[in-house]
């Protein structure tokens, strides 16, 4: 049985007050935090309801679940999509639920692209290049993503590209090396990307990598078991596929390229984009 998540949070707060930034958590404690993370994902499915939740918070007579500051504090303001996204960007810049973890770096990296995009692509977290340029997917993996979009017949400016975590995860003696975000880091930043989704209202979302699938959809397992199907996020279809960096790590494997491309073909079909015979045959074995 999992430990009461309130006890885990109290322990983490006490350790933080003592100046500790890293602690060991056993499986029960981790499971408690995972349950909290899943509840947070469910609670922020519709960011426009956040203000109402805040108003009702003090009037609730039932025993509340552990309070998630990100859910309570986030406000969406503005007359149009661009203005609303700007309001989220400003709040993200000093997002206390993320900064309080003391495990993320200081520079915030927000999204890029069109507020009216039909296609939204979400990565896990910014890396060294993204932190330096303050824009998601600008390094080698970003170039791969640009190539994929070009092959689809769309430009980077037509889509909306974001990351689940808005700050680069930190490491001891860190230079250009990166690490994937933890469940706690994803939970802290989840309200931000959920607000972006609510504002942009894309026709579909591409989740780039297993970490995003875990943080955004609560999935766990191998990418091969998650892809080739549509998942649902607040009524928006989501396709899970390989992160562009995996193309680099796989040594240019045509099998990996074809698998990713098949997910993109499925997205193109759902978006009613034209698909040529040449596009259909990309990365197929030559007869």
Go through the PLM ranges and name each one.
Residues 5-46:
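N-terminal intrinsically disordered, low-complexity tails
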Residues 21, 37-287:
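A polyanion-binding, active-site-adjacent surface
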């Amino acid at each position: 049985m999992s430990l009461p998540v309130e006890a885990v949070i109290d322990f983490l707060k006490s350790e933080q007050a003592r100046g500790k930034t890293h602690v060991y958590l056993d499986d029960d404690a981790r499971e408690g935090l995972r349950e909290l993370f899943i509840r947070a994902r469910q609670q922020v499915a519709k960011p426009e309801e956040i203000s109402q939740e805040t108003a009702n918070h003090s009037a609730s007579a039932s025993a509340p679940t552990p309070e998630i500051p990100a859910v309570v504090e986030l406000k969406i303001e503005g007359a149009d999509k661009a203005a609303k996204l700007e309001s989220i960007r400003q709040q993200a810049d000093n997002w206390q639920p993320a900064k309080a973890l003391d495990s993320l770096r200081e520079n915030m990296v927000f999204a890029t692209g069109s507020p009216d995009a039909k296609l939204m692509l979400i990565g896990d977290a910014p890396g060294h290049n993204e932190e330096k340029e303050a824009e998601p997917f600008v390094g080698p993996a970003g170039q791969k993503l640009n190539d994929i979009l070009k092959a689809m017949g769309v430009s980077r400016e037509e889509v909306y590209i974001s990351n689940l975590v808005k700050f680069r995860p930190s490491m001891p003696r860190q230079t250009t090396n990166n690490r994937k975000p933890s469940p706690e880091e994803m939970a802290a930043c989840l309200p931000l990307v959920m607000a972006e989704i609510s504002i942009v209202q894309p026709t579909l979302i591409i989740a780039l990598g297993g970490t995003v699938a875990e943080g955004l959809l609560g999935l766990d397992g191998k990418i091969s078991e998650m892809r080739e199907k549509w998942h649902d996020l607040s009524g928006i279809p989501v396709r899970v596929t390989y992160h562009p960096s995996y193309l680099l790590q796989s040594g240019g494997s045509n099998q990996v390229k074809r698998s990713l491309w098949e997910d993109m073909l499925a997205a193109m079909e759902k978006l009613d984009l034209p698909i040529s015979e040449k596009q259909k045959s990309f990365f197929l074995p030559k007869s």
